[in-house]
A protein has these predicted regions:
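Active-site-adjacent loops and short helices of periplasmic peptidoglycan-processing enzymes
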Residues: 1-155
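Domain-terminus/edge residues, biased toward the C-terminal soluble/receptor-binding domains
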Residues: 121, 132-280
Length: 280
């Protein structure tokens, strides 16, 4: 792969890395940011899952991967989300971008504003779907940051990334299988997204939850960019995840929500101050 990164998503610690700040084309990994903004709009109740959105001529004519919707349809937001995530549908992605942003151009502005707010210094978006375009780029580090934010901020929507097959009613029975092969070979994997263009190569952001000794449900995240084939990106991602769970040991220093020290305070409002990690 041109670049890769393995991160302990629970702690935000990088475990393995290669060229993680080199600019790369994200291909359909762009849809991770599109999904983030769609989920944010859902959480803010700007849209709802059962709300229907129109399919514009622009969305209908999108090249590349599609869920095969057309302008005669009014498609529920939830089905567009499934089409974007499972089928990597560029038409579904455009319909969502237009529905949330009012236009694709305004939605791209929102994408770049969110990237800046997240500190994604090596990322710039030119479109919501990830087709090759000058100036459209990211880095492995930024993709890891974005993915961990997606997992942390919207856990209620993670289940969409585990769907293995999906086809919208009335559309052709093709391109309906999730392109993340790790979902079919590793039961601990629950996401996230594949990407491919001739310029970007084969890319995959994968995440899994497994138990470390005395620390259940530890989440690791792998980013593999610019692999030579579908098989290579899957195998490299699987190797990274397996290595992370076997080469590292998580050590719990103390429980969250419990004080580990209570130093005295001189002339303070309280006689002592409890110190420790606030979160349980």
């Amino acid at each position: 792969a041109k670049a890769y990164l393995l991160m302990d998503a629970s702690a935000g610690q990088v475990l393995a890395a290669k060229d993680i700040d080199a600019p790369v084309e994200p291909a359909s990994l762009t849809k991770l940011m599109t999904a983030y903004l769609v989920f944010d709009a859902l959480k803010a109740r700007k849209i709802s899952l059962n709300q229907t959105l129109p399919v514009s001529e622009r969305a209908w004519k999108m090249p590349g991967s599609r869920m095969f919707i057309d302008p005669k349809m009014q498609v529920p937001v939830e089905d567009l989300i499934k089409g974007m995530i499972v089928q990597s549908g560029n038409d579904a992605t455009m319909a969502l971008a237009e529905g949330v942003g009012g236009s694709a151009e305004r939605f791209v502005q929102l994408m770049n504003e969110q990237a800046k707010a997240m500190g994604l210094a090596g990322t710039q978006y030119r479109n919501p779907e990830g087709l090759t375009e000058p100036g459209h780029h990211t880095t492995a580090r930024d993709l890891a940051t974005l993915s961990t934010r997606l997992l942390r901020d919207f856990p209620e929507y993670l289940h969409y990334y585990t769907i293995r097959k999906y086809r919208y009613t009335g559309t052709p029975a093709c391109n309906d299988t999730n392109r993340n092969p790790l979902l079919f070979r590793d039961p601990t994997v629950d996401g996230l997204k594949t990407g491919h263009t001739s310029a970007a190569g084969y890319c995959l952001v994968a995440t899994a939850r497994r138990d470390f000794p005395n620390l259940p449900g530890r989440r690791l995240l792998s980013v593999v960019l610019g692999a030579s084939s579908e098989t290579a990106r899957a195998n490299e991602s699987q190797k990274l995840l397996n290595w992370g769970y076997t080469a590292y040991e998580a050590v719990k220093l103390f429980d969250g929500g419990q004080p580990v020290a209570s130093p005295k305070v001189w002339k303070g409002k309280s006689a002592e101050l409890k110190l420790g990690r606030g979160e349980p």
